[in-house]
Curated annotation (Swiss-Prot):
This is Ethanolamine-phosphate phospho-lyase. Belongs to the class-III pyridoxal-phosphate-dependent aminotransferase family. The gene is etnppl. It comes from the Eukaryota. Keywords: Lyase, Mitochondrion, Pyridoxal phosphate. The lineage of its organism: Eukaryota, Metazoa, Chordata, Craniata, Vertebrata. GO terms for cellular component: mitochondrion. Catalyzes the pyridoxal-phosphate-dependent breakdown of phosphoethanolamine, converting it to ammonia, inorganic phosphate and acetaldehyde. Its main location: mitochondrion. GO terms for molecular function: ethanolamine-phosphate phospho-lyase activity; pyridoxal phosphate binding; transaminase activity. Pfam families: Aminotran_3. It is found in: Mitochondrion.
């Protein structure tokens, strides 16, 4: 039997043999997970953690039906898709049945990155064009072609990292974006920016192959595009000879509840040309898929070049995929996402009335974001405060992450078996954390705080030298003048001393 390593030993070996860019959660005190079940994960001491961040274990960690399907098929056969096998075509039929009729051709691959990379190949072959429009703060994968279309990543490389054939459109964020909730038609306004990008590209003798977007931005801060945005963008992109790629890698398979696919939130009159899938598709097993139209698939095949993927669509992966689809239906996980998601959002909105640090609650189903702000008037991101909260929750055995361009958005994307009791537990703990934090940093909690009223923060006069110095009220946005990464600042303001500092290099969760 193999020796069981301590956390310290694991970190020592990781430092020696695992690349330094491969990060872990809670780097100052990482968690060693030894098993998981449903929405819970367990460490080496048997401590149970509520998992609020794992959109990979879609139907629940270690679901017995998924395990049974994998074992049964693995005992019989696992080979590649060049041999005929029932599982491949059965799974293709079942998957296609969840999509609009025109999306009818599958390419099975092994990760979301592979899926998005193949989607770009399909788009470029079909259109004969090269350029791609992507959204600001987008993340689409780790391979070179996808880093190129992921501002979330390439902005870290400097101002010259953006390729000339990549065009970045504003994220359709109606809370802190270019056009906000008070705009009469933010969907049209954001879509007009895409039209302007296309026109500018044409002026520079460039042609658009594709517009790609997550149906709801995850790493970008849990952004829900305004209704009608995708329809208008699709119209402009098609007119320019391009195609629309909907990235469902993080948000597909019923997470929004009402619909199986998040792009369907835009309405029945919107149809992407290519849809990519990953993460939840195999409940932790490495598999993914690209689904497109017959016309695009035929154009790709017309090159005469075979497309073969060694592991894509193998019998074991397809058996697992079938089990996941079956569980989503049998256990009514879409219904659960709607019911529990609505309950979670209601509880969080109650906390918004109580806590000035909460600027916005947004989400659909079990995809929810809590935008933390230093003040509601200027919507100044509460980055250090968000990191403090997720570390304090970790102490309570609750796993939550923060992301977005300022790392100030608490992200809920739990396994789909997440229930009302779990939601109540998490929100109660967030309430306690915010209450203690607001008291420590001098923000006055007020249930009746108006959206246009800044949260006031009491700041001691550090130059007086008097421990009983008179407190003065300042708009909390002034706190930007001090570095939230400074250790003394963090301790003096009640922030968790071990929580990670604000850096442009983020762990994608």
């Amino acid at each position: 039997m193999c020796e069981e390593y301590t956390k310290e030993k694991i970190m020592e070996i990781r430092k020696k043999h695992i690349g330094p860019s491969c990060k872990v959660f809670f780097a100052n005190d990482p968690i060693k997970i030894v098993h998981a079940k449903g929405q819970y994960m367990f460490d080496e001491k048997g401590e149970r953690y509520l998992d609020c961040i794992n959109n990979v274990a879609h139907v629940g960690h270690s679901h017995p039906e998924v395990t049974k399907a994998a074992l049964k098929q693995m005992e019989l056969l696992n080979t590649n898709s060049r041999f005929l096998h029932d599982n491949l075509v059965r799974y293709a039929e079942c998957l296609i049945s969840t999509l609009p009729e025109k999306l009818s051709v599958c390419y099975f691959v092994n990760s979301g990155s592979e899926a998005n990379d193949l989607a770009l190949r399909l788009a470029r072959q079909y259109t004969g064009h090269q350029d791609v429009i992507t959204l600001d703060h987008a993340y689409h994968g780790h391979v070179t072609s996808l880093i190129d279309i992921s501002p979330y990543k390439f902005h870290q490389l400097g101002k010259d990292a953006q390729k000339e054939y990549i065009h970045v459109a504003p994220s359709p964020d109606t809370y802190r974006g270019k056009y906000r909730e008070d705009h009469p038609d933010p969907a049209s306004a954001y879509a007009k920016d895409v039209e302007d990008i296309i026109q500018k590209a044409h002026q520079n003798k460039r042609q658009i192959a594709a517009f790609i977007a997550e149906s709801m931005q995850s790493c970008g801060g849990q952004i829900i595009p305004p209704a009608g945005y995708f329809q208008k963008v699709s119209e402009f992109v098609h007119k320019a000879g391009g195609v629309f790629i909907a990235d469902e890698v993080q948000v597909g398979f019923g997470r929004v509840g009402k619909h199986f696919w998040s792009f369907q939130l835009q309405g029945e009159d919107f149809l992407p040309d290519i849809v990519t899938m990953g993460k939840p598709i195999g409940n932790g097993h490495p598999m993914s898929c690209v689904v497109t139209t017959k016309e695009i698939a035929e154009a790709f095949g017309a090159t005469g070049m075979e497309y073969f993927n060694t592991f894509g669509g193998n019998p074991v992966s397809c058996a697992i995929g079938l089990a996941v689809l079956d569980i989503i239906e049998k256990e009514d996980l879409r219904g659960n996402a709607t019911t529990v998601g609505n309950y979670l959002t209601e509880l969080l909105n109650e906390q918004k009335q109580k806590h000035p640090l909460i600027g916005d609650i947004r989400g659909v189903g079990l995809f929810v974001g809590v935008d933390l702000v230093k003040d509601r008037l200027f919507r100044t991101p509460a980055t250090a405060e968000a990191q403090h909260i997720i570390y304090k929750l970790k102490e309570k055995r609750i796993l939550l992450s923060a992301d977005g361009p300022y790392r100030n958005v608490l992200k809920f994307k739990p396994p789909m078996c997440f229930n009302k009791e779990d939601a109540k537990l998490v929100v109660d703990e967030i309430d306690q954390c915010l209450t203690a934090l607001e008291k420590a940093i001098g923000i006055q909690s007020n249930a009746g705080l108006h959206e246009k009223t800044s949260a006031k923060r009491k700041v001691h006069n550090e130059n007086s030298g008097d421990t009983n110095a008179k407190e003065k009220e300042t708009c909390s946005s002034n706190s930007q003048e001090r570095n939230p990464n400074d250790h003394a600042y963090r301790q003096s303001n009640g922030l968790h001393p071990e929580s990670p500092t604000f850096t442009r290099k983020r762990i994608r969760t």
